[in-house]
């Protein structure tokens, strides 16, 4: 037999195994016969792959299912507790880390808030969170299978953080540092791309194929899912729409541009606008998204107007995106999603100003995952990297 034939047979076998596992994961519990029907594989192939997956502790046998005639079939379950992933969202002033099982269920989480930290200081906080999550991890056949990290900046295809202006990071190889310390695969992803994937897999975007995810925190990032797939652009740098110009003669942004969208429609812009309007919390606490939300909830009309102003600017940028991509769904996530009550009306007003042809079958929704979309997205990347058969490595 030629080597190429052997290689191709090996690739097919690995592909079949991955297909069987994915089918069990999606339709659990499921019988061997139903796997064959779902995948089109013959029963012998299914039986062989199921045996391997059972030996590897990635699936389990449960009690018999309902019979359609003859013996009741043995049902198969995806073993979501075979291992665990860690997903981390590094923001400008916080780190959120979550521990998930292989199905994406959150088993533990840790949050650290900070202000104006250096890279080295943030790295130490990151180690603290990851160490704590690992310590809390239950015993399992595979233990920690991977770590995913979302960052607010451009990330190269090999995981180097090229530029994160709001963190003052440039050319940071965090992936190499993390893999050396924890000895597991580490994936670094733009936080908005990860958030878009998290919403598509677990949240408001489950039923949509063309999604614009707008991550609104200290800055603004955008993740694009087009025809069901995450779009990253030629070099992986798509989605930096927080830096599109909406005011030609506007103030200078950290990125070097003028009049960037995030200078007018982000959490930072909200707090800055409230400060300029002389708004002060009654308790004497510092101005923040939380304190402004509380004032708005208590009926402060001045604060509500500031929210509505930010919502209007948010709508301007979203309209530009709608006109370019014609999506079926726009999801607004990250920290400003908690202010939907004050942002929704001005957003709808701006939406009415976009091309009427683009408004048909379009929905604008707020995140169902709130601040967890990015962490869930990168944790899912880590789990799927472990579970997927990569033919490049065969």
Task: Give the location of each predicted region.
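Short, active-site-adjacent cap segments at secondary-structure transitions
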Residues: 67, 153-157, 194-197, 221-222, ...
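Short glycine-aspartate micro-motif
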Residues: 85-89, 144-148, 211-215, 221-223
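Active-site/binding-pocket entry motifs
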Residues: 96, 153-155, 194, 202, ...
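Short, acidic, Ser/Thr-enriched surface-loop or helix-capping motifs
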Residues: 101, 156, 225
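Glycine/GP-enriched mid-protein hinge/lid loop-to-helix segment characteristic of carbohydrate kinases
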Residues: 109-111, 117-121, 170, 176, ...
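Glycine-rich phosphate-binding loop and adjoining helix at the ATP-binding site
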Residues: 109-210, 342-353
């Amino acid at each position: 037999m030629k080597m190429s034939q052997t290689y191709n047979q090996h690739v097919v076998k690995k592909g079949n195994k991955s297909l069987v596992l994915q089918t069990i994961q999606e339709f659990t519990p499921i019988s061997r016969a139903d796997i064959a029907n779902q995948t089109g594989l013959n029963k012998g192939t299914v039986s062989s792959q199921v045996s391997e997956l059972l030996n590897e502790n990635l699936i389990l046998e449960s009690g018999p299912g309902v019979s359609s005639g003859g013996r009741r079939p043995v049902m198969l379950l995806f073993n979501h507790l075979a291992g665990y992933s860690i997903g981390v969202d590094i923001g400008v002033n916080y780190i959120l880390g979550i521990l998930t099982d292989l199905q994406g269920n959150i088993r533990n989480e840790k949050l650290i808030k900070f202000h104006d930290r250096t890279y080295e200081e943030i790295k130490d906080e990151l180690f603290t969170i990851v160490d704590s999550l690992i310590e809390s991890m239950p015993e399992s056949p595979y233990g920690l299978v991977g770590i995913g990290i979302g960052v607010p900046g451009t990330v190269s295809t090999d995981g180097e953080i090229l530029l994160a202006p709001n963190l003052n990071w440039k050319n940071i190889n965090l992936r190499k540092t993390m893999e050396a310390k924890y000895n597991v695969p580490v994936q670094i992803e733009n936080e908005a791309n990860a958030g878009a994937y998290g919403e598509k897999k677990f949240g408001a975007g489950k039923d949509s194929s063309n999604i614009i995810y707008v991550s609104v925190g200290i800055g603004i990032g955008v993740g694009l899912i087009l025809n069901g797939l995450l779009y990253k652009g030629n070099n992986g740098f798509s989605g930096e729409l927080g830096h599109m110009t909406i005011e030609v003669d506007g103030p200078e942004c950290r990125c070097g541009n003028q009049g960037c969208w995030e200078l007018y429609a982000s959490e930072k812009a909200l707090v800055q606008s409230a400060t300029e309007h002389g708004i002060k919390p009654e308790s004497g606490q510092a101005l923040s998204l939380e304190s402004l939300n509380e004032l708005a909830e208590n009926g402060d009309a001045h604060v509500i107007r500031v929210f509505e102003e930010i919502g209007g600017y948010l709508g301007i940028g979203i309209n530009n995106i709608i006109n370019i991509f014609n999506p079926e769904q726009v999801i607004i996530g990250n920290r400003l999603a908690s202010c939907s009550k004050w942002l929704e009306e001005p957003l709808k007003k701006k939406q009415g100003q976009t091309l009427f042809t683009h408004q048909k079958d379009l929905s604008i929704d707020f995140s169902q995952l709130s601040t967890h979309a990015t962490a869930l997205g990168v944790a899912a990347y880590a789990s799927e990297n472990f579970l997927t058969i990569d033919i490049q490595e065969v």
